[in-house]
């Protein structure tokens, strides 16, 4: 059996040429918290605790996937946004920290209804619903993305009116006070530099 300290060393040794040290450290502790439930300080306290072979193998799978430049959020199938847990997969984009600023800005406004266009994971409407008593709707053209968004709403205990619709060919939108959309804004040429 391996120890927690061995797992930490394994991440560092295997990924030091793949990413900068700070990113490797972040991946390490996010993965440990995901699989073992340990915070960074728990890792110090439990450095000599045994890790089962199954869990050790899972850490190795994570490292292998990181070496292919697959984002950790997709490997784990989840991310955090606005202090909430969200499922993510290949049908959704990973919420960006800048989008939290957009949510902050919207929450400063008084409103009783809002619509998110191109919802993806549902992170914007779910964060709004967790922090404001309002009727929130969300539209996406992708049924697969809406499936993830519905799961995220359930996980976070909020009700959102999810609508499968192509915003470009439909004018049948809910009447709301606020409309928000945060479509992808990374250029195709920039994608390679992100990973």
Which stretches of residues belong to each language-model region?
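Conserved SAM/SAH cofactor-binding pocket of Class I
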Residues: 98-193
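A general structural signal for well-ordered alpha-helical segments in protein cores
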Residues: 8, 28, 59, 72, ...
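A short N-terminal interaction module
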Residues: 1-55, 59
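Conserved AdoMet
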Residues: 34-108
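Secondary-structure boundary/capping signal
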Residues: 19, 23, 39-40, 71, ...
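Non-catalytic, surface-exposed connector residues within folded enzymatic/regulatory domains
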Residues: 22-26, 53, 75, 96, ...
